[in-house]
C-alpha cells in the first residue's frame, strides 16, 4: 500500500506549520500535529475481503458467503505515528444462508487505549460508537446482520451468474457503505495498525463463532465452537484446513469471486498449489481465474464496479481535512 512520504526541513522548501515536514509533502500543511496519509491498498484501489462461513468444515467453498470491499486511510503525525484511522467498507455480495455480522479487531492495540470513534452508514450522518465490551483488544462491530443490511430476507445477493438467478437470488447495485473513523488520544505506532489487521465475520445468532484470515485468532482469544463438537479439519489458531486452505482472504484489488455453489478450486485452480505449498508457491492464485466459474463476467460487472468505485470515491475523497473534522 501507499506509505506517506515524510521529507524534513533542510531541503530548501517551506514548512508553514513548522512541524519539520515540508509543505510539498505535508498533507496537512497548516496543522503541526498531522503530516501525511497512508492509503490502503493505495489511493486508487479498493481491496476485497472474502469469507467462507462454514468454519471449521470446508462447506461448498464458494468463497462468497460474505464479500466486502474496503479502502483504508491512516493519518500520520510528523513522527510517522498513526493519529487516526478512516476505514471504509461496502457489502459487495452475500451467498450465505446463515445471518452474518462483520467486525474489525486491531490485535496489537489494547481495548483500554484512549480514543474516540464514529460509525456512519451510507453517508447518513456519523454516530458516536464504542469498541466491543469484553474484548482485550480494540474491536469494532461494523454490522450485526448482512441480511438485514441488504434487506434480503433469506435471499442470496449478487452471487448468481447472469441468467442463472433463481427465487433465492437477488441482484443489488445500491450497496450499503460504512465509515469507521477512530481518532487516538495519543498517536500509536504505525505497526500497531498494519494491515490486514483482524477483520472477521461472526454468526449473528452465535457471535462466539467467528471466521478469520489465516494466522489470526478469535477476537476473544479462544472459541468454544459450541455447535461444532469436532473441528479436526481446522485449527482455530490459524484458520487453515489441514490441507492449507483458508476460510478468508484479503485481496488488495476488486476481486472477481466465484459464483454460487462453485468451488474456489474450480474458479481459481492455482489455489490448490498455493495451499499445498503452505503459501510459498502460486502466491497470486487469485489472479488466475477459470472462465465460466465467476460472478460478474458480463456488462453488469462493469456497472457494479462503477457504482462501488463512485460511491467509495464520493465518501473517501471529500476533501483534505473534512473526513476527520479537521
Language-model features and meaning:
Residues 70, 83-93:
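Short, well-ordered beta-strand segments enriched in hydrophobic/aromatic residues
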Residues 40, 59-60, 95-99:
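A short beta-turn/strand-edge loop motif at beta-sheet boundaries
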Residues 64, 96-113:
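Low-complexity, serine/threonine/proline/glycine-rich extracellular segments that form mucin-like
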Residues 144-326:
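A eukaryote-biased signal for long
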Residues 43-82:
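Short N-terminal edge-element motif at the start of the domain
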Residues 126-145, 149, 153:
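C-terminal globular interaction/adhesion domains in large, modular proteins
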Residues 1-49:
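Extracellular calcium-associated, cysteine-rich motifs in secreted modular proteins
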Amino acid at each position: 500500500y501507499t506509505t506517506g512520504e515524510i521529507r524534513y526541513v533542510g531541503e530548501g522548501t517551506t514548512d508553514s506549520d513548522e512541524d519539520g515536514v515540508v509543505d510539498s509533502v505535508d498533507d496537512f500543511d497548516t496543522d503541526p500535529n498531522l503530516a501525511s496519509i497512508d492509503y490502503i491498498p493505495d489511493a486508487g484501489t479498493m481491496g476485497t475481503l472474502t469469507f467462507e462461513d462454514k468454519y471449521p468444515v470446508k462447506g461448498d467453498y464458494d468463497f462468497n458467503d460474505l464479500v466486502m470491499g474496503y479502502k483504508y486511510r491512516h493519518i500520520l503525525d510528523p513522527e510517522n505515528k498513526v493519529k487516526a484511522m478512516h476505514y471504509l467498507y461496502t457489502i459487495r455480495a452475500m451467498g450465505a444462508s446463515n445471518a452474518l455480522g462483520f467486525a474489525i479487531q486491531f490485535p496489537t492495540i489494547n481495548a483500554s487505549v484512549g480514543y474516540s470513534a464514529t460509525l456512519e452508514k451510507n453517508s447518513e450522518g456519523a454516530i458516536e460508537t464504542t469498541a466491543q465490551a469484553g474484548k482485550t483488544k480494540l474491536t469494532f462491530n461494523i454490522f450485526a446482520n448482512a441480511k438485514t443490511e441488504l434487506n434480503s430476507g433469506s435471499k442470496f445477493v449478487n452471487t448468481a451468474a447472469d441468467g442463472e438467478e433463481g427465487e433465492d437470488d437477488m441482484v443489488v447495485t445500491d450497496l450499503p457503505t460504512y465509515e469507521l473513523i477512530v481518532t487516538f488520544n495519543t498517536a500509536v505506532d504505525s505497526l500497531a495498525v498494519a494491515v490486514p489487521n483482524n477483520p472477521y465475520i461472526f454468526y449473528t445468532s452465535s457471535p462466539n463463532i467467528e471466521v478469520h484470515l489465516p494466522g489470526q485468532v478469535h477476537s476473544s482469544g479462544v472459541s468454544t465452537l459450541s455447535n461444532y463438537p469436532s473441528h479436526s479439519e481446522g485449527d482455530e489458531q490459524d484458520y487453515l484446513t489441514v490441507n492449507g486452505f483458508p476460510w478468508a482472504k484479503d485481496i488488495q484489488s476488486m476481486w472477481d469471486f466465484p459464483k454460487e455453489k462453485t468451488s474456489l478450486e474450480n474458479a481459481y485452480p492455482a489455489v490448490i498449489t498455493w495451499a499445498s505449498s503452505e503459501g510459498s508457491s502460486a502466491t497470486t492464485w487469485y489472479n488466475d481465474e477459470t472462465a465460466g466459474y465467476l460472478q460478474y463476467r458480463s456488462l453488469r460487472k462493469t456497472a457494479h464496479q462503477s457504482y462501488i468505485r463512485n460511491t467509495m470515491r464520493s465518501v473517501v475523497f471529500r476533501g483534505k481535512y473534512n473526513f476527520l473534522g479537521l
